[in-house]
Amino acid sequence: MQLPDGPTVVPFLHSLKWRGRYLEFLEWCERRYGGIFTYKKFGSRPYVVVSHPQAIKEIFTAPSKYFDSGKSNQAFRPLLGNKSLLLLDGNEHQRQRKLLMPPFHGDRLRTYSRAIEDITQQEISRWSTPQPFVIRSAVQVITLRIILRVLFGSEQELQAQALNQCLTSLVNSFLSPFPWQLLFFSRQKQQLDNLLYTQIQQRRQQGNFSSPDILNLLLATRDDTGQLLTDEEIRDELITLIMAGYETTTTTVLWSLYWVAKIPEVQEKLVAQLKALDSNLNPTAIAALPYLRAVFSETLRIYSITGFTFDRIVKIPLKIMDYEFEPGTVLSPCSYLTHQREEIYPLPKQFKPERFLERQFSPYEYYPFGGSNRLCIGMAFAQFEIQLILATILSRLHLSLADCQPVRPIPRGINLIPPLKLQIIAAQR
């Protein structure tokens, strides 16, 4: 098998040369080697990085039998558990995905809208101050409260303060670049497990699953054979949903607020569209506003949450464009590079929501939530939630940056986040 060309310098030397310039390194590789190139990470098998839309299409449309996708996510097993949807393949993955899809689509979204709006309003009432403040911690409070309300029905039921402290410590340890932080990981994970298993067992004993929170839905769900989910399966899916609804949602809201605070024209256009609505219009209509959707989409284009979708490990010999890949080859679809292709997105470094009003992009040109049977099950909910948060904030507050200097995304685990100390100034409209 002849792998695509790629950098041949020792990975350690690459790390020194491109230190702190992760995205620039990817762009350099694509310019030099094209939309499919091989990168050899130190101590691991080669990775084939894929950004060409035709290659992405061939990966996403290939039957799932060609890949072991869950196997590529094993690094998350210590955090997410053995039964997390992200780690499963084959029939087991298909079963879990089918069971977990309903809470995040259709009428279920509307049941969450009041919680999203109420929590956001409560928290931003503390933002109006002439002094700059660090926006990350303020947004984290909103997103954590929302995911707790959606998952458990009440923030108090799960001792939200204890969960907040435990979850924050656990995420920081798991994502930290410093190995000694992992010394605390096992103890923090055990504390979180105790909280979750206690809640699961208490709900089972009550036997009343009528409220629409996701824990109740998971407890009441049966598969095609009539089998209920086990406590372990529910725990692992709760952790997966918390991580998705907390860290990645926080990152997307932060980038959205950064761009609307940085570009006054974008902010004022959004506000004008919100003001044109009837104040009693339902949240579903607010989330469907064309320019609001365009701002959300452009935010995820310019800095995709992770930069990559989850890897696929080839299980059966497979041809992608002109390359034959043998079992064991790791294919890494790179959404960041695809979203920066100038022939698809002219002036790709500029934040231009209008591009999403002018044309519709294919799922192989724009895929911030992945694709195929690995498309994020929470995509519809994430878009609905984030757009409601933005609408609630901007209808009440005018935002500006404390420092107008351009910022660079920072790799944090698999996420590309704004600077931790990014400051915002919020004023009442």
What do these predicted regions represent?
Residues M1-L3, D68-R77, R108-T251:
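Cytochrome P450 heme-thiolate monooxygenase catalytic core
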Residues M1-R95, R110, R114-Q122, L347, ...:
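N-terminal membrane-proximal hinge/A-helix region immediately C-terminal to the signal-anchor transmembrane segment
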Residues L3-V9, S113, E117, Q165-S169, ...:
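Cytochrome P450 I-helix active-site segment
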Residues H14-G34, N194, T198, L281-M321, ...:
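Conserved cytochrome P450 K-helix E-x-x-R motif and the immediately C-terminal K′/meander segment
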Residues L26, R95, I239, P283-T284, ...:
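Cytochrome P450 heme-thiolate "Cys pocket" and heme-binding signature region
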Residues E30, T120, L163-C166, K275-A276, ...:
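Cytochrome P450 proximal C-terminal region
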Residues T248-Q273, A380-L397:
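Cytochrome P450 catalytic-core helices
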Residues P333-R359:
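Conserved cytochrome P450 K-helix/beta-meander segment immediately N-terminal to the heme-binding cysteine loop
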